[in-house]
From Swiss-Prot:
Family: Belongs to the universal ribosomal protein uS15 family.
Example of a GO MF term: rRNA binding
Organism: Shewanella oneidensis (strain ATCC 700550 / JCM 31522 / CIP 106686 / LMG 19005 / NCIMB 14063 / MR-1)
Source species taxonomy: Bacteria, Pseudomonadati, Pseudomonadota, Gammaproteobacteria, Alteromonadales
Leader sequence segment: none
Function: One of the primary rRNA binding proteins, it binds directly to 16S rRNA where it helps nucleate assembly of the platform of the 30S subunit by binding and bridging several RNA helices of the 16S rRNA. Forms an intersubunit bridge (bridge B4) with the 23S rRNA of the 50S subunit in the ribosome.
Name of the gene this protein is made from: rpsO
Protein name per the record: Small ribosomal subunit protein uS15
């Protein structure tokens, strides 16, 4: 359940600091959020797909850790990212 190349490029353009910025915390969180949203739609149709659900939980955990790191190191960027993504924090 990966994202298309176009979707990734759009996220990189919106949240990246440069053209090839794939490693910044904001980009990683935005990519994880897009994948999580995609999987949530998948589970509306495939309720009993427990293998993918485990992957979803890993993504949510990774996003939570990245957000905690960003909040601890740069609170202003954290708040901007939360607002852009529409996360409940």
């Amino acid at each position: 359940m990966s994202l298309s190349t176009e979707a990734k490029a759009k996220i990189l353009a919106e949240f990246g600091r440069g053209a090839n910025d794939t490693g910044s915390t904001e980009v990683q969180v935005a990519l994880l959020t897009a994948q999580i949203n995609h999987l949530q739609d998948h589970f509306k149709e495939h309720i009993h797909d427990h293998h993918s659900r485990r992957g979803l939980l890993r993504m949510v955990s990774a996003r939570r850790k990245l957000l905690a790191y960003l909040k601890r190191t740069e609170a202003v960027r954290y708040n901007e990212l939360i607002q852009k993504l529409g996360l409940r924090r």
